From Swiss-Prot:
Pfam family, one: Intron_maturas2
GO CC term, one of those recorded: chloroplast
Gene symbol of the encoding locus: matK
InterPro entries cross-referenced by the UniProt entry: Domain_X, Maturase_MatK, Maturase_MatK_N
Subcellular location: Plastid, Chloroplast
Entry protein name: Maturase K
Function recorded in the entry: Usually encoded in the trnK tRNA gene intron. Probably assists in splicing its own and other chloroplast group II introns.
Keywords attached to this entry: Chloroplast, mRNA processing, Plastid, RNA-binding, tRNA processing
Gene Ontology MF: a single term: RNA binding
Secretion signal, residue range per the UniProt entry: none
Family (UniProt): Belongs to the intron maturase 2 family. MatK subfamily.
GO biological-process terms attached to the record: mRNA processing; RNA splicing; tRNA processing
Superkingdom assignment: Eukaryota
Length: 507
């Protein structure tokens, strides 16, 4: 790792980074194994060659040689029983080399970003682009805005677009050819043709490789916001120079002037709205503004034309809806978000006259999506589709403590993730489902009924393991009661929830 850093540190001022020779280095694949990238498939093959679960540059060289010399007609034949090395086929070839390729490709981008911040001595302005800024945006900004547009960042229409994006950053022809080989190999696989899904979601074996490509793609799509912010507010963003700088980017902007009435400077007034906010979590993004509906339509038109003209992305403009916040709810980060208006009447007395003043206060609400969450529990066999708890036969062979610990951990994870919700009714229902499902699983193991089991051990026996997180924290760190304590405990955002997505991962 230090050798790689020294190499890129010397060459960081040049755009060309020749990373192809690193694919033949042993420590690259040891580093990839350290990150737990497909270790089982790779090291299962190493055992067949007698290398005792160790990476070898000789194996890598053989793989690359066979990738260039292989006959696809022979590989497509089902001869996995005759030769396990060939039997792994494309999985072995692509996964083994692409896992090291992904690690190598991440290093120059991360180092360029770090060196750029050090050279320009930027004050913490880049933290505004951190994913942790989503929570302050929800609490402080969203309730003061009027319109919101939920945008799903489109996937690239052609794989060559991904290669062209990296080509402007890393001008290493062998690495780009290898990347092109990986992408077309995955695209031509039978599993991808059957599923008819995007290449970013087709493979579960090499998530790091496709996650890196997707992040580069999303970063490229978001570059327009960095450019407009830099031109409008003169915010010097160093990451714009190192990561977002592309070949002929300003030429693309000049060509875009034709769409915006041939005068780019005069159209910047549309983007100087200080109340325009953009946030993104994974592939979903929100564009919110305090301006009028017409201004939001201009932003929508601009993004659609920009993505289609310069990135060849079809974003389906008919699916980008502009809604008013006070009468619309939307899903984001597995939450159901909304802004409600609470009306209240205040009587004012002045001398002998009294006035009745109607006030309207906007309140930001975060709700737990009940139906999707119950559907997730039903898929995991904790309840049926109607939310009625059922036993978990797969856990009946475990010990009682393991079963209770398993159910308690699931509820605590759910409670931890949805600690930012305004109302806890759905969490109480989830707690009831898991608690009764745990009791029925234990009763099935002991050949009894759930009622008899709870009567024998008592309800507090399960309550101890299904205790809410706030109650655990209050026992560890007792707090004195205060008028603001009630409002504080209603909604708590934990920063580590960004690492998981409840509705996309199995419980």
């Amino acid at each position: 790792m230090e050798e790689l850093q020294r190499y890129f540190e010397i060459d960081r001022f040049r755009q060309q980074c020749f990373i192809y020779p690193f694919l033949f280095q042993e420590y690259i694949y040891a580093l990839a194994h350290y990150y737990a990238l497909n270790g089982s498939i790779f090291y299962e093959t190493m055992e067949n060659f007698g290398y005792d679960n160790k990476s070898s540059s000789l194996i890598v060289k053989r793989l690359i040689t066979r990738m260039h010399r292989q006959n696809r007609l022979i590989i497509s034949i089902n001869d996995s029983n005759q030769n396990r090395f060939i039997g792994h086929g494309k999985n072995l070839y692509t996964q083994t080399v692409s896992e090291g390729f992904a690690v190598i490709m991440e290093i120059p981008f991360s180092l360029q970003l770090v060196f750029s911040f050090e050279e320009k001595e930027i004050t913490k302005s880049h933290n505004l682009r951190s994913i942790h800024s989503i929570f302050p945006f929800f609490e402080d900004k969203l309730s003061h805005l009027n319109h919101v547009s939920h945008i799903l960042i489109p996937y690239p229409a052609h794989l060559e677009i991904l290669v062209q994006i990296l080509r402007s950053c890393i001008q290493d022809a062998p690495s780009l050819h290898l990347l092109r080989f990986f992408l077309h190999d995955y695209q031509n696989s039978n599993s991808l043709k059957a599923r008819k899904k995007s290449i970013f979601v087709c493979s579960k074996e090499n998530r790091r490789f496709f996650l890196f490509l997707y992040n580069i793609h999303v970063y490229e799509c978001e570059s327009v916001f960095v450019f407009l912010r830099k031109q409008s507010f003169h915010l010097r963003s160093t990451s714009f120079r190192t990561v977002l700088e592309r070949t002929h980017f300003y030429g693309k902007i000049e060509h875009l002037v034709v769409v915006l009435r041939n005068d780019f400077q005069k159209t910047l007034w549309m983007f100087k709205d200080p109340f325009m906010h953009y946030v993104r979590y994974q592939g979903n993004s929100l564009l919110a503004s305090k301006g009028t509906h017409l201004r939001m339509k201009k932003w929508k038109s601009y993004l659609v034309h920009f993505w289609q003209s310069h990135f060849y992305l079809w974003s389906q403009p008919n699916r980008i809806h502009i809604n008013q916040l006070y009468n619309h709810s939307f899903y984001f980060m597995s939450y159901l978000l909304s802004v409600r208006q609470n009306s209240s009447a205040v009587r004012s007395q002045m001398l002998e006259n009294s006035f009745l003043i109607d006030t309207s206060i906007k309140k930001f609400e975060t709700l737990v999506p009940t139906i999707p969450l119950i559907g997730l529990l039903a898929k995991a066999k904790f309840c049926n589709v109607f939310g009625h708890p059922i036993s978990k036969p797969a856990r009946a062979d475990s010990s009682d403590s393991d079963i209770i610990s398993r159910f308690g951990r699931i509820y605590r994870n759910l409670s931890h993730y949805y600690s930012g919700s305004s109302k806890k009714q759905t969490l109480y229902r989830i707690k009831y489902i898991l608690r009764l499902s745990c009791a029925r699983t234990l009763a099935r193991k002991h050949k009894s009924t759930a009622r008899a089991f709870l009567k024998e051990l008592g309800s507090p026996f399960l309550e101890e393991f299904l205790m809410e997180e706030e109650q655990v924290l209050s026992l560890i760190f007792p707090r004195t009661p205060s008028p603001s304590y009630r409002s504080h405990r209603e909604r708590i955002w934990f920063l580590d929830i960004i690492c998981i997505n409840i509705l996309t991962n199995h419980v």
